From Swiss-Prot:
One of its GO terms (molecular function) is guanosine tetraphosphate binding. This is Translation initiation factor IF-2. Residues 351-364 have a biased composition (Gly residues). Residues 474-481 are annotated as: G1. Residues 267-276 have a biased composition (Pro residues).
Length: 965
């Protein structure tokens, strides 16, 4: 339709006619009313004006676009609880357009018109607002009036009811008064009539009650009968479905057990009209679908299974969602059937006409006999008893509850924690999740890990011969390391601090007669535990005894370790090249210790050797290999590795490093190992020369990296099948170790408290010990604890492997401890912090230097010993009584010297009657500091006046003497 006037054009543009008139006036087209005609020229002028006003008609106009960027940072915690900094950038964009002068003039020209139009628009809007306000006020008044009217009506109704109630009560009272008067006038007749009426009323009421009871009983009986009928129908329906499912499962088993060629197509049953199943009403929240067909149910089984169910081929039962049976009720397969067929098991040789072939359907017309399967939701929520171990993943927890992992993740999100499907949950959190989902959580203790490890020990791998593990033991400085150096052609002893071995060294040597693995143990008395570990891991012990020194304490200890472990001994009498060597004396001393040489009828070969010249080394190796042949050492090679931690340390760059002796099996790089409470994957494996190796067989020492923490020396190393089992056993052991440690600390606190109560104040020397390897740290701590006595005790605040860090200095500041670094150093930050806090850090590389200095420090903490030294004897010649002073003795110094600061004992007939201090010492009338032998003096004793002639004063001084441990 052509728009000839303003109103029609406004309707075409879908805008108010008044706004269009304002725009036409602004464009210079003078139109006064909506009925004014519009020409094409007027429309063109309006379009040109609108284009100019919006800046789209001038090609020469220039635009300036300004973009402001503002960057800020926010901190947000991720799922693991770590704070992450996120960069946030805010961009603001503004565009400025420079208009031409003609547009500005036109804008100025039309400014007055626009202002007028704006005034009109403002007035119109004010009028509309005023009108709306009036309407609102009117509505509020009407509402208020209606509420008042309702209130008045309610008050009137209540008043009427109250009046009616009062009138009724008044009438009742009057009637009662009249009845009372009537009863008073004719008591006998009224009483009889009242009794008859009451009896009739009671009979009527009793009859009504009996009728009501009969009606209620009838209704209850009908309801119970209906409920029982419904329950019976449900039980029959469930029994039919269970029988049908069992028949289908039996058919599946028979089909799977029958050879493919022998399978014959089952006869097709006549088509039956499908019945729409009754949808069961689910009560509560269900977290698992219905029971599988083969699962034993607590409900009674069906008495009459469907006869045709066994002959039918099995159909894949798929749980349907809510309302999933709508399409199946009519007997025709819907989208649920298609999805079931696509998800079905594709079985080759199936004769079911394509029911279970997925998208590979059979020939046409064969799929008509398939039956629609329905999901019957359980009528009660299934509450499961979930056993929760100490750690469990989200996926495993969901599997235990038979729910989807997303449900567990949702519950964790409600609890305020973001988790993934593979994230580990602790036992407490997992139990909360189980309770949130409506199940019963039970804290399940892990099975005994040792039992699990024992079960895994059985291996069918063949036993193959393995090299012997030989431990070299003996007293300190008897030449053990030098002997090994000659065998290995190395120079280890020259580089050891103080010339003594303080670590266990593990080496394997390839000799012409075979491979031998040597363990070099320390001989110092502090390393008892190290030597015990060496004897535990060994097959043969070489006992090194110096020919010029004989049997020493650590030699006896090594003999006892070897006997306790049942390990054969090979005695090497070293240093036979020295002039003062006496091998025969050594033999006699060893016989006294129970080590009898073969030449005396014993079983221990004695080999004289010299680590300096190499004499007798070949004979020693030959005897060792001979003993190994007698022992017939064998171990499986193609099996998971088992071994022993010989030594462990914390490297600053590599992390925890452990020296392991493989005892059986093969340790490969990448295996998951468990060592005590430490576990991890072997990231790198080095031999004793520092070269990387990929595998280590039995009796081969290697150094591995990748453990979670520094293991304790002497722990057993086992290769685990996966990270999860290793982590579970390690956490189990950590918990046990923590409980034992806390119990020991509690017992120690109680013991210390009782001892302090009984013996008074005890001095403590707090120490923090940091060592390079686990064995040295253990030996140093044990040696320092042995220095404790009843008055001064060593308190090990903290001991660990690794360098001295800031946390150690902070701990020393809090506990006022001294830090001892054994073959370790403090980093720059720790040194600065120690200097600022005045913490003493001592460095040692020889163990007995550390022990001696701590012993000296403890000696300084001992209370000094007080000793009395008699300096003189005085004889009382005369006694003077001085007022306000007391008794003053005139004395003669018969021996020694008397000092003013000395103490005295008063002797009478050589019996001590008083011990005290001098109050004054005078010679003539002058106070003096001392009086020597042969001079007279006047003396008074503090707080003692019972002085008689002939008494003697024994003068003595108390001196303090420093004590030593």
């Amino acid at each position: 339709m052509a728009s000839n006037n303003v109103a029609q054009f406004a309707a075409e543009l879908k805008m108010p006619a008044g706004v269009l008139l304002e725009q036409l006036q602004a464009a210079g087209v003078q139109k006064a009313s909506e009925d004014d005609a519009l020409s094409e020229t007027d429309k063109a002028r309006l379009l040109d004006h609108l284009r100019r006003s919006h800046g789209s008609n001038d090609a020469d106009k220039r635009k300036i676009t300004l973009t402001k960027r503002h960057t800020s940072e926010i901190k947000q915690s991720d799922a693991t609880g770590k704070a992450r900094t996120i960069q946030v950038e805010v961009r603001k964009k503004r565009t400025f357009v420079r208009r031409d002068e003609a547009a500005e003039q036109a804008a100025e020209a039309t400014g007055n018109g626009q202002e007028a139009a704006e005034d009109l628009e403002l007035q119109r809007r004010e009028e509309e607002a005023r009108h709306e306000a009036e309407l609102l006020e009117k509505q509020a008044q009407e509402l208020k009036a209606r509420q008042e009217q309702l209130a008045r009506e309610e008050a009137e109704r209540q008043a009427r009811e109250q009046a009616a109630e009062a009138e009724r009560r008044r009438a009742e009272e009057e009637a009662a008064k009249k009845r009372a008067a009537a009863v008073a006038e004719a008591a006998a007749a009224a009483r009889e009539q009242a009794e008859q009426e009451r009896a009739s009323q009671d009979e009527e009421r009793a009859a009504a009650e009996r009728a009501a009871q009969r009606e209620a009983a009838k209704k209850a009986e009908d309801a119970a009968r209906e409920q029982a009928e419904k329950a019976r129908l449900e039980q029959e329906e469930i029994a039919k479905r269970r029988a049908k499912a069992e028949a289908e499962a039996r058919a599946i088993r028979e089909m799977m057990n029958t050879p493919r060629k022998a399978q014959v197509k089952a006869p097709e049953p006549p088509p039956k009209p499908a019945e729409a199943p009754k949808p069961a009403e689910a009560k509560g929240t269900l977290h698992k679908p219905a029971r599988p067909a083969g699962e034993t149910s607590a409900r009674p089984a069906a008495k009459k299974p469907a006869p045709a169910a066994a002959a039918q081929p099995a159909a894949t039962t798929q749980p349907a969602g809510p309302g999933g049976d709508k399409k199946k009720a009519g007997g025709k397969g819907g989208w649920q059937d298609d999805a079931a067929k696509r998800r079905g098991i594709k079985t080759r040789g199936d004769t079911s006409g394509g029911v279970d072939r997925g998208w590979r359907g059979g020939p046409k017309g064969r799929g008509k006999h398939q039956e629609s399967t329905t999901f019957q939701a359980p009528t009660e929520p299934i509450v499961r008893e979930v056993h929760v171990p100490e750690t469990i993943t989200v996926a495993d927890l969901a599997h235990k509850m038979s729910v989807k992992a997303s449900e567990v993740i949702k519950v964790m999100m409600k609890l305020g924690q973001m988790v993934t499907i593979n994230q580990m949950l602790d036992q407490e959190t997992a139990m909360i999740v189980v309770e949130e989902l409506g199940h019963h959580a039970v804290a399940a203790k892990l099975d005994d890990p040792e039992a699990m490890l024992v079960e895994g020990e059985a291996s069918d791998a063949p036993q193959l011969p393995r090299p012997p593990v030989v431990t070299v033991m003996g007293h300190v400085d008897h030449g053990k390391t030098s002997l090994l150096d000659y065998i290995r052609r190395a120079k280890v002893a020259a580089g050891e601090a103080g010339g003594i071995t303080q670590h266990i060294g593990a080496y394997h040597v390839e000799t012409p007669r075979g491979v031998i693995t040597f363990l070099d143990t320390p001989g110092h008395e502090a390393f008892t535990a190290m030597r015990a570990r060496g004897a535990k891991a060994t097959d043969i012990v070489i006992l090194v005894v110096a020919a010029d020194d004989g049997v020493m304490p650590q030699t006896k200890e090594a003999i006892s370790h070897a006997k306790a472990g049942g390990v054969p001994l090979v005695v090497a009498i070293n240093k036979i090249d020295k002039p003062e060597a006496n091998p025969e004396r050594v033999k006699q001393e060893l016989v006294a210790e129970g080590v009898v040489p073969e030449e005396y009828g014993g079983d221990s070969p004695f080999v004289p050797v010299s680590a300096k010249t190499g004499a007798g080394i070949d004979d020693l190796l030959e005897n060792v290999l001979l003993q190994a042949e007698v022992l017939e050492l064998k171990a499986p090679v193609e099996a998971p590795a088992k071994g022993l931690v010989i030594e462990a340390k914390l490297d600053k760059g590599k992390g925890p490093v452990a020296t392991i002796l493989v005892q059986s099996g093969t340790l490969n790089r990448g295996d998951v190992v468990l060592a005590g409470s430490a576990y991890g994957r072997v990231r790198a494996m080095l031999d004793e020369t520092g070269k990387p190796t990929k595998a280590a067989g039995p009796s081969i020492p290697v150094e591995i990296q990748g453990l979670s923490e520094v293991p304790a020396a002497g722990e057993e190393v086992i290769v685990m099948p996966d990270d999860r089992k290793a982590r579970e056993v390690a956490l189990f052991r950590q918990g046990k170790f923590r409980d034992v440690k806390l119990a020991k600390q509690q017992a120690a606190k109680l013991e210390n408290m009782l001892e302090q109560m009984g013996e008074g104040e005890v001095q403590y020397l707090p120490l923090i010990v940091k060592a390079d390897v686990q064995g040295s740290q253990e030996a140093l701590v044990q040696s320092l604890l042995k220095l404790s006595n009843d008055e001064v005790r060593v308190q090990i605040v903290h001991s660990a492997v690794g360098g001295i860090s800031e946390s150690d200095v902070n701990l020393a500041t809090a506990s006022k401890a001294v830090i001892i670094g054994f073959n370790t150093r403090a980093d720059a930050q720790a040194r600065k912090l120690a200097e600022s806090n005045g913490i003493d850090i001592r460095y040692y590389n020889i163990i007995y230097d550390a022990v001696d200095e701590v012993k000296a420090a403890m000696s300084g903490m001992l209370a000094p010993e007080k000793r009395e030294v008699v300096t003189g004897m005085v004889e009382v010649r005369q006694v003077f009584k001085v007022p306000k002073v007391g008794a003053v003795a005139g004395c003669m110094v018969t021996d020694g010297v008397v000092k003013r600061t000395s103490s005295v004992r008063v002797l009478r007939n050589n019996v001590v009657i008083h011990t005290g201090e001098l109050d004054s010492l005078k010679r003539f009338k002058d106070d003096v500091k001392e009086v020597r032998q042969g001079f007279e003096c006047g003396m008074s004793v503090k707080n003692f006046n019972d002085i008689m002639e002939g008494d003697q004063f024994e003068v003595f001084e108390v001196t303090e003497v420093a004590r030593t441990l």
